[in-house]
């Protein structure tokens, strides 16, 4: 996507967006200055204008850490109603903004300085880009005259973030700030959501420099649209494609609704349920879509994929029609691609035309917003039914699915007296002891998969995780952001000991800001998922995966950071610890659950294998195969 030309150090960006999300032409200048008498025009510095623009966009909270190049923007925050959450590491600011966006649907905002601060937010930007999270990131930059001189804390932020943002821009004129901010929020939240970065040189926001003076204005919606002539996301499905999809659905004997995170981004959970019930079609929800369809619904099959349950994986594999809604046929779902759902025709709905046919060629591709397309599909199906078209007999398919569910439920071997604690047991007890609308935030690894498997997600926007990038260290800061966004909800971060050690310092942020998140560490003293692969595929050659159950002492570490620290080592201690944590609501709580390091995540489709080769728990017979 295009951006306005900057100094030669930052070359012009080529069009790369996954949904034609930006501008191929240089960004236009802002709207004409107000025609009111000059004495009544509001004169602001660039820093004041930036904060005022955020206020006008409805920003109530932002996450960040000040530094030299961004200091002029931090000064007007003192006089702003915007709440600023001071993080301990810039990566934490980005993940907090992600967590906030996940649970609210509003763009998360983070702000950091130049150089190493900007590079520290690259991981959250990439994470948000892969999971289509609306984010607006503001970075400081050295003065325009210093760009290209290797000045202190200078880096090519635009170049570095080009491939991990939906749009990025170096602002070179303070008069451009209001329009740039409006564009950023518009691009981040429309079409396929994603992160947008604004790089702000110090001299255009510093009130001590004449070059930062600007005359305040606020662009209208029409002016914003006119400034983005190449950006027109398609939201409604093509009528011909809608009709073809409806006809396929009415003919299918083994259909499955394959639901991805795009359904949640489109706020389409209610429409999805109406479609599933109208057509009596079973639903699988990917890792990014958990909660889009209630797990307690009779048509819910749960999560597919590498660690999905047997029924979800096998129903997709043996279907004759996959109705893919906001999903991208990720390799973790398809397994070996040429063996994936070999008899299935595909209807693929996505807001991003680049996703259609990227992995699996659909018989019916539909570009559009998932909610609008689902509503159009429902109407088209009703019209066909009114004309006398009936669904075929699917009783045999339903009986087959019921047989799989009965034969291959999620299971694990319970701990014998005196044995180590099972992580699945911890999650079951935690699930049953918390409100149904509890927000669960996971890191990456075994604990992430167990959380998605054993929690029952009956409400949308109650599951937050790093799906595409798989970012260790995501859970704690993202949970803090989620709690800021939904202070009325209980928020539990489920983390592994490896993940926790990467970003645990943000619990100091939570304690200082009185953000009472709760953290369950499933501490198996290993990098658990890596250990599992080494055991299963590398002849039990455990290379560099052992951590230690006692270094650090998580209970003492939590207390040192201003949290309540608890430790649980046996099954009979679990309920009391969870109850105590749930009763504390004035500061963060961390529970160190000492779990069995030998426990593995099942089911599992080995990497590179077709989904037919799914491995279930060995207790279910046939050696787990």
Task: List the model feature ranges, each with a label.
Residues 139-180, 200-202, 289-397:
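Glycine-rich, acidic loop regions that bind phosphate or pyrophosphate groups
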Residues 138, 146-153, 313, 357-359, ...:
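Thiamine diphosphate
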Residues 60-64, 82-85, 103-142, 258-261, ...:
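A short, small-residue-rich loop immediately preceding and capping a beta-strand
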Residues 102, 261-347, 448, 458-488, ...:
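Glycine-rich, anion-gripping cofactor-binding loops and their flanking helix/strand elements
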Residues 42, 175, 224-228, 343-444, ...:
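Phosphate/pyrophosphate-binding active-site segments
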Residues 187-251, 410-412, 616:
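Conformationally flexible catalytic loops at phosphate/diphosphate-handling active centers
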Residues 49-59, 100-105, 129, 187-192, ...:
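Glycine-rich phosphate/diphosphate-binding loops that line cofactor/substrate pockets in enzymes
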Residues 50, 65, 73, 399-477, ...:
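Active-site diphosphate/adenylate-binding microenvironment
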